[in-house]
Protein backbone atom coordinates (compact mmCIF):
# COMPACT_ATOMS: atom_id res chain seq x y z
CA UNK A 1 0.00 0.00 0.00
CA UNK A 2 1.48 3.37 -0.95
CA UNK A 3 1.61 6.30 1.43
CA UNK A 4 -0.89 8.19 -0.71
CA UNK A 5 -3.46 5.46 -0.15
CA UNK A 6 -2.81 5.47 3.58
CA UNK A 7 -3.34 9.22 3.66
CA UNK A 8 -6.59 8.90 1.76
CA UNK A 9 -7.80 6.12 4.05
CA UNK A 10 -7.01 8.12 7.19
CA UNK A 11 -8.72 11.18 5.78
CA UNK A 12 -11.75 9.11 4.77
CA UNK A 13 -12.00 7.64 8.27
CA UNK A 14 -11.63 11.13 9.77
CA UNK A 15 -14.47 12.47 7.64
CA UNK A 16 -16.69 9.51 8.56
CA UNK A 17 -16.22 10.24 12.27
CA UNK A 18 -16.87 13.97 11.76
CA UNK A 19 -20.04 13.16 9.83
CA UNK A 20 -21.24 10.90 12.67
CA UNK A 21 -20.83 13.79 15.12
CA UNK A 22 -23.51 15.81 13.38
CA UNK A 23 -25.81 13.17 11.87
CA UNK A 24 -27.52 11.90 14.99
CA UNK A 25 -30.82 13.39 16.17
CA UNK A 26 -30.95 15.60 19.25
CA UNK A 27 -31.52 13.43 22.33
CA UNK A 28 -34.84 13.82 24.16
CA UNK A 29 -34.47 11.92 27.42
CA UNK A 30 -31.77 12.08 30.10
CA UNK A 31 -30.61 8.57 29.20
CA UNK A 32 -30.27 9.56 25.54
CA UNK A 33 -28.38 12.72 26.52
CA UNK A 34 -25.93 10.73 28.66
CA UNK A 35 -25.43 8.22 25.87
CA UNK A 36 -24.93 11.01 23.31
CA UNK A 37 -22.45 12.75 25.60
CA UNK A 38 -20.41 9.55 25.90
CA UNK A 39 -20.53 9.01 22.14
CA UNK A 40 -19.30 12.57 21.58
CA UNK A 41 -16.37 11.99 23.95
CA UNK A 42 -15.50 8.77 22.13
CA UNK A 43 -15.73 10.33 18.68
CA UNK A 44 -13.70 13.37 19.70
CA UNK A 45 -11.00 11.04 21.01
CA UNK A 46 -11.10 9.16 17.69
CA UNK A 47 -10.74 12.46 15.84
CA UNK A 48 -7.74 13.49 17.94
CA UNK A 49 -6.09 10.13 17.29
CA UNK A 50 -6.71 10.35 13.54
CA UNK A 51 -5.51 13.97 13.44
CA UNK A 52 -2.31 12.90 15.16
CA UNK A 53 -1.75 10.05 12.71
CA UNK A 54 -2.42 12.32 9.71
CA UNK A 55 -0.08 15.00 11.06
CA UNK A 56 2.62 12.41 11.77
CA UNK A 57 2.43 11.15 8.19
CA UNK A 58 2.69 14.69 6.88
CA UNK A 59 5.68 15.46 9.08
CA UNK A 60 7.39 12.16 8.21
CA UNK A 61 7.58 13.19 4.58
CA UNK A 62 10.71 14.85 3.34
CA UNK A 63 10.95 18.65 3.21
CA UNK A 64 10.96 18.53 -0.60
CA UNK A 65 7.57 16.80 -0.67
CA UNK A 66 6.15 19.27 1.87
CA UNK A 67 7.36 22.28 -0.12
CA UNK A 68 5.97 20.81 -3.32
CA UNK A 69 2.64 20.12 -1.60
CA UNK A 70 2.42 23.70 -0.30
CA UNK A 71 3.23 25.04 -3.76
CA UNK A 72 0.53 22.82 -5.28
CA UNK A 73 -2.00 24.10 -2.73
CA UNK A 74 -1.08 27.70 -3.51
CA UNK A 75 -1.51 27.08 -7.25
CA UNK A 76 -4.84 25.34 -6.68
CA UNK A 77 -6.12 28.23 -4.56
CA UNK A 78 -4.95 30.75 -7.14
CA UNK A 79 -6.67 28.92 -10.00
CA UNK A 80 -9.82 28.44 -7.91
CA UNK A 81 -10.00 32.14 -7.05
CA UNK A 82 -9.56 33.12 -10.71
CA UNK A 83 -12.56 30.99 -11.73
UniProtKB/Swiss-Prot annotation:
<comment type="subunit">
    <text>Homomultimer; when bound to the RRE. Multimeric assembly is essential for activity.</text>
</comment>
<keyword id="KW-1048">Host nucleus</keyword>
<dbReference type="GO" id="GO:0051028">
    <property type="term" value="P:mRNA transport"/>
</dbReference>
<dbReference type="GO" id="GO:0044196">
    <property type="term" value="C:host cell nucleolus"/>
</dbReference>
<protein>
    <recommendedName>
        <fullName>Protein Rev</fullName>
    </recommendedName>
</protein>
<feature type="short sequence motif" description="Nuclear export signal">
    <location>
        <begin position="65"/>
        <end position="76"/>
    </location>
</feature>
<keyword id="KW-0694">RNA-binding</keyword>
<feature type="region of interest" description="Homomultimerization">
    <location>
        <begin position="17"/>
        <end position="24"/>
    </location>
</feature>
<keyword id="KW-1035">Host cytoplasm</keyword>
<feature type="short sequence motif" description="Nuclear localization signal and RNA-binding (RRE)">
    <location>
        <begin position="29"/>
        <end position="45"/>
    </location>
</feature>
<dbReference type="GO" id="GO:0003723">
    <property type="term" value="F:RNA binding"/>
</dbReference>
<keyword id="KW-0813">Transport</keyword>
<dbReference type="GO" id="GO:0030430">
    <property type="term" value="C:host cell cytoplasm"/>
</dbReference>
<keyword id="KW-0509">mRNA transport</keyword>
<comment type="function">
    <text>Escorts unspliced or incompletely spliced viral pre-mRNAs (late transcripts) out of the nucleus of infected cells. These pre-mRNAs carry a recognition sequence called Rev responsive element (RRE) located in the env gene, that is not present in fully spliced viral mRNAs (early transcripts). This function is essential since most viral proteins are translated from unspliced or partially spliced pre-mRNAs which cannot exit the nucleus by the pathway used by fully processed cellular mRNAs.</text>
</comment>
